[in-house]
Amino acid sequence: MKTAIFTVVLALAVFAVLSFGWEANEKALSEEFTELIHEKEAASETEARECRYFWGECHDHMPCCDWLVCRYKWPIAYNICVWNRTFPEK
């Protein structure tokens, strides 16, 4: 009877250690994944935009993209980029 109880306790201890290891591995993978996502976001944010997109605020130092033109719109108190009825070439 003592050996059966000892075996059960030992098996539970092994399962606890294995599940802790699995959980630690899963957490490490999750942290690695979130770090990768943050790196991708940071890389896209650091790229300087050469032009302003649709409905973006524009000035002389912030030009619109090729298929947009900078116009003053009355309800809005600043110039915005609007479509000039052309399409960008790819």
Swiss-Prot record:
Pro-sequence residue ranges: 20-50
Per the UniProt entry, the disulfide pairs are 51-65, 58-70, 64-81
Signal peptide region: 1-19
Query: What does it do?
Result: Ion channel inhibitor.
Question: According to its UniProt record, what is one Pfam family this protein matches?
Answer: Toxin_12
Q: In which tissues is it expressed?
A: Expressed by the venom gland.
Question: Which family does the record assign?
Answer: Belongs to the neurotoxin 10 (Hwtx-1) family. 13 (Hntx-13) subfamily.
Question: Domain text from the record?
Answer: The presence of a 'disulfide through disulfide knot' structurally defines this protein as a knottin.
GO molecular function per UniProt? ion channel inhibitor activity; toxin activity
Q: Which UniProt keywords apply?
A: Disulfide bond, Ion channel impairing toxin, Knottin, Secreted, Signal, Toxin
Keyword Secreted attached: yes
Q: Which InterPro entries match?
A: Huwentoxin-1
Query: Where, subcellularly, is it found?
Result: Secreted
Q: What is this protein called in UniProt? A: U7-theraphotoxin-Hhn1g
Cellular component, GO annotation: extracellular region
